[in-house]
Amino acid sequence: MEGALAERVGAEPFHRVTPLLESWALSQVAGMPVFLKYENVQIAGSFKIRGIGHFCQQMAKRGCRHLVCSSGGNAGIAAAYSARKLGIPVTIVLPEGTSVQVVRRLEGEGAEVQLTGKVWDEANVKAQELATRDGWVNVSPFDHPLIWEGHASLVRELKESLGTPPGAVVLAVGGGGLLAGVTAGLLEVGWQHVPIVAMETRGAHSFNSALQAGRPVTLPDITSVAKSLGAKTVAARTLECAKECEVLSEVVEDREAVSAVQRFLDDERMLVEPACGAALAAIYSGILWRLQAEGRLSSALASVVVIVCGGNNISSQQLQELKIQLGCS
């Protein structure tokens, strides 16, 4: 390994320690302290840089000469940023409906961008084909132990900030990488008793479907507007997570997720994408209250942490269009 590359590979992780702040507005809605883990302020715009950055650094150590990543947006941006930092070429394969702003961001990071297929799963087939080339390595957006290991850093930060465990952690599930990473982190710090509320939108609810079936299942199509959650088949590891920790799977409608995005913008002055709105809907749509009423969550939660996962796949114009499309007030 050349000296300059060795220095970049051996450097600090590419992710930053993100703020954990109590939200007065969401705490008022929930009736309990709500802490927001602001992963949307990561330099690559989402939590994905934790796991993907770690993966790419490890692959560079092993002599990777070209990275390729299929993505709905966030994973690709994390891979492109990591590749630029490492000085390694990268190809990002996106579904054809990906927004222009995401494509421009990727090209700005120096990535080659290819548009293939209607949904992420189809783009992923192309990425896997490209990864068969000599020296190329496929960067899974969510399904690799190194990815989960990187995401686990988020929980170590939670422990350092909070000291004591929260009553629950709320997160969005797409392919399941964040869920797998948070599970790994909870086990690592001894917080395995902390429930995870795993939120999805209907039409991208591959984890909920897998839990009901007891095995990974493939959705016929991704019909949700939360395209960042658009994996038709969730990682098999997520089913193991549900056995290792208490995982409560909940599904909300697109309208609830988009309404949560608007309310969060008004409350916290931050624009996040519908995938993140799915997690926020646990508060805004009263999911936590219902889980408490059903006895599935403690009626006396000391606090709740909501992971604000990212905001790359949204603009003010897109938000207005989604509100009109879904009939949001």
From Swiss-Prot:
EC number in record: 5.1.1.3, 4.3.1.17, 4.3.1.19
Molecular functions per Gene Ontology: glutamate racemase activity; identical protein binding; L-serine ammonia-lyase activity; pyridoxal phosphate binding; threonine deaminase activity
Catalytic function, reaction form: L-serine = pyruvate + NH4(+); L-threonine = 2-oxobutanoate + NH4(+); L-glutamate = D-glutamate
One GO-annotated biological process of the protein: lipid metabolic process
UniProt keywords, alphabetically: Acetylation, Isomerase, Lipid metabolism, Lyase, Pyridoxal phosphate
Modified positions (N-acetylmethionine) in chain numbering: 1
Listed SUPFAM superfamilies: Tryptophan synthase beta subunit-like PLP-dependent enzymes
Assigned GO CC terms: mitochondrion
Tissue expression: Abundantly expressed in liver.
Cofactor(s), names only, from the UniProt record: pyridoxal 5'-phosphate
Short name of any one Pfam family annotated for the protein: PALP
PTM-bearing positions, type N6-(pyridoxal phosphate)lysine: 48
Reported function: Catalyzes the pyridoxal-phosphate-dependent dehydrative deamination of L-threonine and L-serine to ammonia and alpha-ketobutyrate and pyruvate, respectively. Also exhibits racemase activity towards L-glutamate and D-glutamate.
Subunit organization: Monomer. Homodimer.
Family, per entry: Belongs to the serine/threonine dehydratase family.
Protein name: Serine dehydratase-like
Organism expressing this protein natively: Mus musculus
Taxonomic classification: Eukaryota, Metazoa, Chordata, Craniata, Vertebrata
Gene: Sdsl
